[in-house]
């Protein structure tokens, strides 16, 4: 099976369009890509890189370097490298929602997304907290954020919250939903029949038997015991400061961190260029780059395409595995 994937560049003034141009310089055999984007923005990126780009009708086949099938999502105003324009916020969101709807309808099998500038979208009059939340709302589901590279996968019990709000946000129902979502995704999309999930404690030293906080004793441990009784292979709660040692990571399929900066610094240190962002719980695989819009680099030809390449490869793999598991 050769999955059909949506490719969304993200912020038109950032590095997303040029990364997409670089991506299609090698024809792909693992998937067929359909870009949801403004054609002039893609052409400008190709010209800046001095690379070939042939924008094709949706029904065509990409055969030579630079071929890219396109579904037009026109910008409101011409984009300029490094100068994000809130007037184009609607086009950015429209491309994301169009890609998501194409997957929900069964037309496409997955979505690969470039970086989006949250502040610019909000300045354009659109309430936007992130692509993860946008696609979850469109699909009417609750999702889990996971980041991954070639060394480790890290899922998050909470995402973009102030640290003082994290403990209150972690409840037994929310943590149970997160664990069930991660477990199901590892089985269905990663093809792991019995995934091992390491669960980090919320507090230093995983609470030190209640001396450094009671969340582990009162909430995490009882929940893990109940889910283990159902057959889930859950390890923890583990102290976060030692859970990422290589010898321990070798025994886990995924680490569940309780908050953003508990798990992601280790992942990004171990391989930022190859890191990708996955949304678990959607009816289709969505994989994004794990970097920002880099407005200061746009149009200069120096942006590293590794994350987008990794995201596309992984999304194709997940789409194929999902079909096999159906």
UniProtKB/Swiss-Prot annotation:
Keywords: Cobalt, Cytoplasm, Magnesium, Metal-binding, NAD, NADP, Oxidoreductase, Pyridoxine biosynthesis, Zinc. SUPFAM superfamilies: Isocitrate/Isopropylmalate dehydrogenase-like. It catalyses: 4-(phosphooxy)-L-threonine + NAD(+) = 3-amino-2-oxopropyl phosphate + CO2 + NADH. GO terms for biological process: pyridoxal phosphate biosynthetic process; pyridoxine biosynthetic process. One of its GO terms (cellular component) is cytoplasm. A divalent metal cation binds at residues 160, 205, 260. Homodimer. HAMAP family: PdxA. This is 4-hydroxythreonine-4-phosphate dehydrogenase. It comes from Stenotrophomonas maltophilia (strain K279a). The gene is pdxA.
């Amino acid at each position: 099976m050769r999955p059909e994937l949506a490719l969304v560049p993200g912020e038109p003034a950032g590095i997303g369009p040029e990364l997409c141009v670089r991506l299609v310089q090698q024809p792909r055999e693992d998937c067929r890509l359909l870009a949801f984007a403004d054609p002039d923005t893609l052409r400008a990126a190709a010209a800046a890189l001095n690379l070939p780009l042939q924008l094709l009708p949706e029904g065509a086949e990409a055969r030579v370097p630079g071929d890219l099938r396109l579904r037009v999502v026109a910008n409101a105003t011409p984009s300029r490298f490094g100068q994000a324009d809130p007037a184009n916020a609607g086009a950015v969101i429209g491309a994301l929602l169009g890609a998501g709807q194409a997957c929900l309808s069964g037309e496409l099998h997955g979505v690969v997304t470039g970086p989006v500038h949250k502040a610019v979208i909000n300045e354009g009059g659109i309430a936007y907290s992130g692509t993860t939340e946008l696609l979850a709302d469109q699909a009417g589901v609750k999702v889990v954020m996971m980041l991954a590279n070639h060394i480790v996968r890290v899922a998050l019990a909470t995402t973009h919250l102030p640290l003082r709000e994290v403990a209150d946000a972690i409840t037994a129902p929310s943590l149970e939903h997160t664990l069930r979502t991660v477990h199901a995704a590892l089985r269905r999309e990663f093809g792991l029949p019995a995934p091992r999930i390491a669960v980090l404690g919320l507090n230093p030293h995983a609470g030190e038997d209640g001396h450094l906080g009671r969340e582990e004793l009162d909430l995490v441990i009882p929940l893990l015991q109940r889910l283990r009784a159902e057959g889930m292979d859950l390890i923890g709660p583990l102290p976060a400061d030692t859970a990422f040692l290589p010898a321990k990571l070798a025994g886990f399929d995924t680490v569940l961190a309780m908050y953003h900066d508990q798990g992601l610094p280790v992942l990004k240190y171990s391989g930022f260029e190859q890191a990708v962002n996955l949304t678990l719980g959607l009816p289709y695989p969505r994989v994004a780059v794990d970097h920002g819009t880099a407005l200061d680099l746009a149009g200069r030809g120096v942006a590293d395409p590794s994350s987008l390449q990794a995201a596309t490869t992984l999304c194709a793999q997940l789409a194929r595995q999902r079909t096999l598991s159906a």
